[in-house]
Regions:
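Residue-level hotspots at or immediately adjacent to binding/recognition sites across diverse folds
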Residues: 1-332
Length: 332
């Protein structure tokens, strides 16, 4: 849900048979056939829905979703995701990327496989430097590779990463303090329903290449947020909170399972959120916060400035539907 200059963006999809994830309260949009991407914008007082250009996701029965968005200004925003598109020879899954120039969205050409390619998250540092990450899977080899794409202002280029596995691979979050200090987290999972083995994935970009680091927790990493080159935070599936000190990652505490988002405003102001859970760290101790009224889960976050924090999630207005929820604090 990242945005800048007080403008927040939420991305998701609209389904004909559901409300779709992350449609904020107060925003209205028609429910269209198939799974078509949707982008909502907060201008400081109201929500509105931005139109995307027609393309492969406009094809009947196409199922598309946008899962990451980031902007370095109100006139330079990139959104990424994936679409499953019907073709004459079958279904293909391809990565999606769109750019907002302050007036309209345009679709960007994404390099990579046409067999199975998806982008999950993006972070923009300037109009000529943004990174998108995801997974590229090959049906021929059975390998899943962590994908990293760099935007130079006019085109994407693929940058090699050290993560390749025959197991299932998920890339769950990206966060960086600069173009030479970027973190990506996720996990690999052995196939099957029983006795599955998880392995946490941590990658770091130093401005010239990606490196894989050892994680002290192997339940899978769900989110990461960097404060400085010597201070970054991550949340694991088993509730462990990890911290980077400039040299190594360590587990600093273990909270309840079900936490999926971590927001670090500073070294003394860290929030962890999840399913009916909100916990705050003040630099000394962790304190459980009152559950936001009516919200069942918080799953994403954006820090616009010190003390200006947004969470996105969902709630259940009835047993039949799931509705989006947005939580905002301007006090830190």
């Amino acid at each position: 849900v990242p945005g800048r200059d007080g403008a927040d963006l939420i991305v998701g999809r609209v389904r004909a048979d559901a409300l779709g994830p992350l449609r904020p309260s107060g925003a209205t949009a028609p429910i269209r056939p198939s799974g078509t991407p949707q982008i909502n914008h907060w201008n400081g007082s109201t929500w509105s829905t931005s139109a995307l250009p027609s393309g492969p996701c406009s094809v009947f029965e196409a199922d598309c979703a946008l899962t990451g968005v980031s902007g370095d200004s109100a006139s330079d925003v990139i959104a990424v995701g994936e679409g499953t598109i019907p073709t004459s020879t079958g279904w293909v899954t391809e990565a999606l990327a769109y750019r907002w120039n302050g007036t309209a969205w345009s679709q960007l050409t994404v390099p990579g496989s046409v067999t199975y390619d998806e982008l999950e998250h993006v972070q923009a540092f300037s109009p000529t430097d943004a990174w998108a990450v995801g997974v590229d899977s090959s049906a021929a080899t059975g390998a899943a590779v962590a994908t990293a794409l760099n935007w130079n202002g006019s085109a994407w280029s693929q940058v090699a990463t050290p993560v390749s596995t025959s197991n299932d691979l998920s890339i769950n979050a990206i966060s960086g303090t600069s173009a030479s200090d970027i973190w990506v987290v996720g996990q690999t999972v052995t196939p099957g329903y029983h006795n599955r083995q998880f392995t946490s994935v941590i990658m770091h970009y130093n401005g010239s290449s990606w490196a894989q680091l050892t994680a002290p927790d192997n339940s899978g990493l769900l989110d990461v947020d960097a404060v400085s080159p010597t201070d970054a935070w991550a949340i694991a599936a088993d509730g462990s909170v990890l911290r980077w000190n400039g040299t190594a990652w360590t587990v600093v505490t273990t909270l309840a399972q079900g936490n999926t988002a971590i927001a670090a405003l500073s070294a003394t102001d860290v929030w962890v959120a999840g399913v009916v859970s909100l916990t705050h760290y003040n630099g000394t101790s962790w304190t459980s916060q009152p559950d936001p009224a009516g919200v069942n889960a918080l799953t994403g976050h954006a820090v616009l400035s010190p003390g200006d924090l947004w969470f996105s999630g969902y709630y259940y207005p009835s047993n039949a539907v799931t509705a989006p929820a947005v939580l905002h604090t301007s006090s830190g």
